[in-house]
Amino acid sequence: MSALAPITGTLKKRIITDIVIGFSLGGVMASYWWWGFHKNVIDRREAFYADLAEKKKAEN
């Protein structure tokens, strides 16, 4: 009998932990990219084309 209890299931727990952490960080980074960067670029582009349409409408 050893003084230490055998370590069982460590690999399975580690794999599950790594997968959960990976998906969580991936989701956070994707959300940051979408709401922090992408939406600002799209809003700027839409404002540009709306302004351009107003200028063309005023010319005619």
From Swiss-Prot:
Q: Which residues form the propeptide?
A: 58-60
Task: List all membrane-crossing ranges.
Answer: 16-38
Q: Name one GO biological process term.
A: mitochondrial electron transport, cytochrome c to oxygen
Q: What is its main location?
A: mitochondrion
For whether the record's keyword set contains DNA-binding, the answer is: no
Could you list this entry's UniProt keywords, alphabetically sorted.
Cleavage on pair of basic residues, Membrane, Mitochondrion, Mitochondrion inner membrane, Oxidoreductase, Transmembrane, Transmembrane helix
* Localization annotation: Mitochondrion inner membrane
GO molecular function list: cytochrome-c oxidase activity
- Asked if Transmembrane helix is a keyword of the record, the answer is yes
Q: Which residues lie on this side of the membrane: Mitochondrial matrix?
A: 1-15
Membrane topology type? Single-pass membrane protein
Q: Which InterPro entries match?
A: Cyt_c_oxidase_su7a_fun
Q: Which family does it belong to?
A: Belongs to the fungal cytochrome c oxidase subunit 7a family.
What subunit structure does UniProt give? Component of the cytochrome c oxidase (complex IV, CIV), a multisubunit enzyme composed of a catalytic core of 3 subunits and several supernumerary subunits. The complex exists as a monomer or a dimer and forms supercomplexes (SCs) in the inner mitochondrial membrane with ubiquinol-cytochrome c oxidoreductase (cytochrome b-c1 complex, complex III, CIII).
Function, please?
Component of the cytochrome c oxidase, the last enzyme in the mitochondrial electron transport chain which drives oxidative phosphorylation. The respiratory chain contains 3 multisubunit complexes succinate dehydrogenase (complex II, CII), ubiquinol-cytochrome c oxidoreductase (cytochrome b-c1 complex, complex III, CIII) and cytochrome c oxidase (complex IV, CIV), that cooperate to transfer electrons derived from NADH and succinate to molecular oxygen, creating an electrochemical gradient over the inner membrane that drives transmembrane transport and the ATP synthase.
In Swiss-Prot or TrEMBL terms, this protein is called Cytochrome c oxidase subunit 9, mitochondrial
The organism encoding this protein is: Candida glabrata (strain ATCC 2001 / BCRC 20586 / JCM 3761 / NBRC 0622 / NRRL Y-65 / CBS 138)
What is the gene called? COX9
